Regions:
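Small-residue hinge/turn detector
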Residues: 13-14
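Solvent-exposed alpha-helical segments within well-ordered globular domains of core cellular machineries
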Residues: 4, 8, 18, 22, ...
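The Walker A/P-loop phosphate-binding site
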Residues: 7-10, 20-130
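Conserved inter-motif catalytic segment of the P-loop NTP-binding fold
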Residues: 98-184
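Phosphate-binding/switch region of NTP-binding enzymes
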Residues: 189-281
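Conserved catalytic network of the ASCE P-loop NTPase/AAA+ motor domain
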Residues: 61-63, 93-99, 124-131, 155-161, ...
Length: 281
């Protein structure tokens, strides 16, 4: 935390805040690490299966802990359905594509459906009632409420809750409705930036996978190709570790295009959204 953030949170003076931060830094080993040490840390990363082998392969094994994975696309492209699948799969053992933990869902659009969780759980060999017990969800009614929930999640994990997946569906809904017009764009992006950094800190500190869904808009000045573009601007584009564009395909299928990833090539895969969750074509 910065001195300003500590002052705002605790009420101490900035001088005291600086002293606290310097003391904490002196007690931490904040030196550089070798590439081999960093590689060993990467070996502890867990990847949660999407339910589709083709989709998992596109993402390098699944949704990664310690990272933010963003899926954006038009209405009905499968973003929320993937979230439901992940909320079940995170409960599975690691050898079955899970993380042996629970999911926490921040719902800004009222799209979570517990009955879908039950159907996916049954198809995955889990007890539907137990799957719902191993799940926490909350409705966010504005952007401040949404941001406050991230602080609450950090507190829950610190107190021992085995949360391994945080789902925000959707990230931008409240930000778009509360900050309208170009005159408020700078304020919106600044607030969004703070929110994203809290999500990143949560992912890195607690080795949690963060899955966010995002809305899209059409670029009016684009006459050729797909005019669809994710909302949120460069602030969101840079914060997401993995970014996928989802769209409808032929005969009810969905197409996922990997747009950005640290060490993976761009690519596409096809998957299905069924009554029992995400499946291969």
């Amino acid at each position: 935390a910065s001195p300003g953030e500590l002052t705002e949170a605790s009420g101490v003076s900035e001088a005291v805040a600086r002293k606290i931060i310097n003391t904490a830094r002196s007690r931490l080993d904040m030196g550089f690490e070798s590439g081999l040490d960093l590689l060993k840390k990467r070996e502890s990363v867990v990847r949660i299966s999407t339910g589709s082998k083709a989709f998992d392969a596109l993402l390098g094994g699944g949704i990664e802990t310690g990272a933010i994975t963003e899926m954006y696309g038009a209405y009905g492209s499968g973003k929320t359905s993937i979230g439901h699948q992940l909320a079940v799969n995170v409960q599975l053992s690691k050898d079955k594509g899970g993380a042996e933990g629970i999911a926490l869902w921040i719902d800004s659009e009222g799209t979570f459906r517990p009955e879908f969780i039950q159907r996916i759980a049954k198809a995955s060999g889990l007890d539907p009632e137990e799957a719902l017990k191993n799940f926490k969800g909350a409705r966010a009614f504005n952007s401040d409420h949404q941001m406050l929930m991230i602080e609450k999640i950090d507190e829950l994990i610190t107190n021992g809750a085995p949360i391994k997946l945080v789902i925000v569906d959707s990230l931008m809904s409240h930000f778009r409705s509360e900050f309208s017009g170009r005159g408020q764009l700078a304020d919106r992006q600044q607030k969004l930036n703070r929110h994203l950094h809290e999500l990143l800190k949560l992912a890195h500190t607690h080795s949690v996978a963060v899955y966010i869904t995002n809305q899209v808009m059409a670029k009016p000045d684009m006459f050729f190709g797909d005019p669809t573009e994710a909302v949120g601007g460069h602030v969101l584009h840079h914060a997401s570790t993995y970014r996928c564009y989802l769209r409808r395909g032929k005969k009810g299928s969905r197409v996922a295009k990997l747009v950005d990833a640290p060490a993976l090539p761009d690519g596409e895969c096809i998957f299905m959204v069924t009554d029992d969750g995400i499946k291969d074509l």
